[in-house]
From Swiss-Prot:
Keywords: Kelch repeat, Repeat
Protein name in UniProt: Putative F-box/kelch-repeat protein At5g24040
Domain F-box: 2-50
Lineage: Eukaryota, Viridiplantae, Streptophyta, Embryophyta, Tracheophyta
Residues in Kelch repeats: 165-207, 262-308
UniProt cross-references to InterPro entries, sorted A to Z: F-box-like_dom_sf, KIB1-4_b-propeller, SCF_F-box_domain
Species for this entry: Arabidopsis thaliana
Length: 373
């Protein structure tokens, strides 16, 4: 059997070209000196994908591009006490990579800790990719104020062929309803759906896009632009907010509920009488089936990104809990008070400050990560 270190250099180089994660490339290059000399020197972050919108009356929209981010979990088990950190890396329009604080909408420049001033010992730490985020950024002309506004919108993103840079995007953006952008066509196509719907979640799942609006209607869009819609068989009139996310091979609907709209708008977080309901997509019946358990997972409902991980991955985390952002503006959006926790067993909302075992996961960045070297 041929030794790994004796693989032809051209094959090693081709393999390194197909690695789409910067930390995986570092691990690949660390196998031996021959692999390092035969592979990419460093990960090549691509400039933002462009998807120009039709020009609006103010001549805006042709600058539309996609900002891509990845969420990582860093584990450092070789210390006196295992430590963990969850963070986001965002590739800017010019390909520059910026460190972002998860849930707190600020980047490394705002914090005063410029990337790449962090040094991570990958020999003694493990890094896992938890999720990817894609956001459409574009300019829009506001006739009322006669000014240009910079907009960010959640989208669904589906990569088709990485080598040929082929992809599809589904979003509302400046359109009346949903529209799809296909890179092979290099244009947007508006879908024939009810206009002026506000979509609370858009995700790709098994080769299709799923979007849900604030009425609870689910829209399914095929790459061929075929559109189907369905309402759940048991609608809930208590739902105030919805999220979609994938957990393993399942598509999950998360609904925040209150008995009345007044309860939803109570400013004091501790007095909020809210609860969450979880449902799984039933593809055969085009319906959402409510479930009582989240398979031991913790759900993260971020501004543009939703994802999950097993509670056993992080000691101290409790299964069947949800971490989400303050939707009511009752706290400082740049502080940990704006990150909230809901646990199904306790039936109540708390600030992250009240859950000491969770706090260490989100500082920006924790002191043990920063290197002065």
């Amino acid at each position: 059997m041929v030794k790994w270190s004796e693989l032809p250099p051209e094959i090693l180089h081709l393999i390194s070209l197909k690695i789409d994660n910067p930390f995986d490339l570092i691990h690949f290059r660390s196998v031996c000196s021959f692999w390092r000399s035969s592979s990419l020197l460093k990960f090549r972050h691509m400039t933002s994908l462009r998807c120009p919108l039709p020009l609006d009356p103010g001549g805006c929209g042709d600058d539309c591009h996609i900002l891509s981010s990845r969420v990582y979990l860093l584990k450092c088990p070789n210390r006196d006490r295992p430590q963990y950190w969850m963070f986001k890396l965002q590739a800017k329009e010019n390909g520059e990579v910026v460190l972002h604080s998860l849930f707190l909408r600020r980047n490394s420049s705002a914090y005063g800790c410029l990337y790449p001033s962090l040094s991570i010992d990958l020999l003694n730490c493990q890094i896992f990719e938890l999720a990817q985020e894609h956001v459409a950024c574009y300019s829009e002309w506001f006739e009322l104020f006669e000014c240009i506004s910079k907009c960010e919108e959640r989208i669904g993103f589906m990569g088709l062929n990485r080598e040929k840079n082929e992809y599809m995007i589904l979003g509302k953006l400046s359109f009346n309803g949903l529209a799809m952008y296909r890179s092979v066509d290099n244009r947007w196509t508006e879908l024939e759906i009810t206009p002026d719907s506000f979509f609370e979640g858009i995700v790709p799942f098994k080769g299709k896009f799923y979007a849900i609006d604030r009425t609870g209607k689910t829209t399914v869009v095929d790459p061929t632009l075929e559109v189907n819609t369905f309402q759940r068989s048991r609608p809930c009139d208590k739902t105030r907010k919805r999220w979609l996310l994938m957990t393993g091979d399942k598509l999950i609907l998360v609904e925040m509920c209150t008995k009345s709209r007044y309860d939803f708008h109570i400013p004091n977080i501790r007095e909020k009488k809210i609860w969450f309901e979880i449902s799984e997509l039933n593809e055969e019946r085009n319906d959402w089936d409510q479930v009582e358990d989240m398979d031991g997972r913790v759900l993260f409902l971020e501004h543009y990104c939703t994802f999950s991980c097993l509670a056993t991955e992080i000691p101290g985390f409790r299964a069947n809990s949800i971490i989400f952002m303050d939707l009511w503006g009752g706290s400082n959006s740049y502080e940990l008070e704006s990150i909230l926790v809901y646990e199904f067993n306790e039936k109540g909302v708390r600030s992250l400050r009240d859950k000491l075992e969770y706090i260490e996961l989100f500082p920006f960045p924790p002191g043990w990560v920063i290197s002065n070297g």
